[in-house]
């Protein structure tokens, strides 16, 4: 069983912001596996489930806002008894240029509050699919930057990255993590 977590903030006003790139990606991946989200209040998230490559996949979008994402993750992880090593978090990363994707297992949170929240409840030995959103320019406040919408060219670049993640996601299901990592580089 795999747990796939897309990080973002609930609400239409955040839908296409840089901080919600995890939500955008997980919706596209779940859709590829003919799975749709429904709200599960007991887990504080939207959840979608499917079976592929002989294993159950649980997709979640926390509805707690970014800084409390761990609350949803620990609820689902505990209920389904999923190990952190079988968890994949998809999130925005300001330290990567827009549209760049990196895959890694474990490590620090890089100041990302959603990852801090998850680290606080399950540790940091989980997998991360980092989607670059770039850094703010001209002394723009970081919070304002990540909560702002993409420009049209940025959005196109990010969607191409998400398409690459989606088309190669089967490698994760086949436990070919190194091959997935190489495809993202």
Swiss-Prot record:
Site feature: Stabilizes the basic form of H active site to accept a proton: 92
Cell division recorded as keyword: no
Entry's localization field: Cytoplasm
EC number: 3.1.1.29
Molecular function in Gene Ontology: peptidyl-tRNA hydrolase activity; tRNA binding
Binding site for tRNA: 14, 65, 67, 113
Family membership: Belongs to the PTH family.
Protein name: Peptidyl-tRNA hydrolase
Gene this chain is encoded by: pth
